[in-house]
Amino acid sequence: MEEMPCSRVVLLVQLMIISLIINSAASESYSSMIRSHRKAAYAAFFVALLWYNLEDIQQPLPLIFTIFFPAAMQKEIHMTRPVRNYKWKDGKMLSLGDVSLVMGILNVTPDSFSDGGLWNTKEHAMSHMKDMAADGAALIDVGAESTRPGHTELTAEEETARLMQLLPLLLDASSVPISIDSYHYETMEKALSAGAHMVNDVWGFQYDDGSMAAVTAAYGVPAILMHNQNDTVYEGDIISSMKSFFDRTLSIALAAGVKEERIILDPGIGFGKTGEQNMEVLARLEELTQAYPYPWLLGV
């Protein structure tokens, strides 16, 4: 008999754990089940990681596994810091710090690893954005350049042209705030001038000479600042290295005039980290959230 790969055994075990938890809560309402059994979220996250790393599994990850994780993070991160309330001129609002929220991802790209080419037409992008908002997304993140491994890097001009074909329509139709996923300050300035609500910089203000931070400060919008690096080599402890990165990021942000209450941090799961390093960061996430009392975004 052929030996079953270890990763598949772990996958089956995690599926069994989730099944037992769901069965034990069969008498409860669905929302109560999620609140009462947050441990299922961690098993669900392991399932997601394994699912995408097993080449012989062709079916997409079932949606149920994306539901548990945000509920768990509300407990794990201990969201006791003051609530951040954001309100924009167009009437849109966002409250961070009280409960965990879900960000919807809209990639208007032809080559993103998860959904490249699915939403890069006006009709499909509008439909998907509205569906995510209806399903409970508190904000929508729009990206015009893929950041998957091996992606083709765009110039700021190319990214801006692709984004601005759709952004005005999305802003006009959206019922929730829209953030822009870009590390090009030129693209971000165009998007913010068109009415975008938030910055999402996957290089944490460290891609350029401070221009992205200056643009963010000029428009007075919230900014999601992510940890990233070009390789997976860390000298010493990974959390210590990430803290050094965030120290630089915060120094750049505050020096440029970005208000502290508008800063959101992201540990960059899947960026500049191996699978094992990702799991270590998740296991030690509270070390970061305690060191930096800001709202935190997790990409899962």
Where do the PLM segments sit?
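N-terminal amphipathic alpha-helix/helix-capping segment at the start of soluble metabolic enzymes
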Residues: 76-107
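Conserved, mostly hydrophobic/aromatic
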Residues: 106, 136, 199, 265
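Glycine-rich, proline-tolerant flexible connector loops at the mouths of alpha/beta enzymes
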Residues: 113-114, 139-164, 269, 274
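Alpha/beta enzyme core
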Residues: 124-142, 193-194, 250
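Conserved anion-binding
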Residues: 147, 206-274
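Active-site-adjacent beta->alpha loops and helix N-cap segments on the catalytic face
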Residues: 152-164, 186, 206-219, 279
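Alpha-helix-loop-beta-strand connector modules within alpha/beta enzyme cores
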Residues: 153-179, 218-222, 285-296
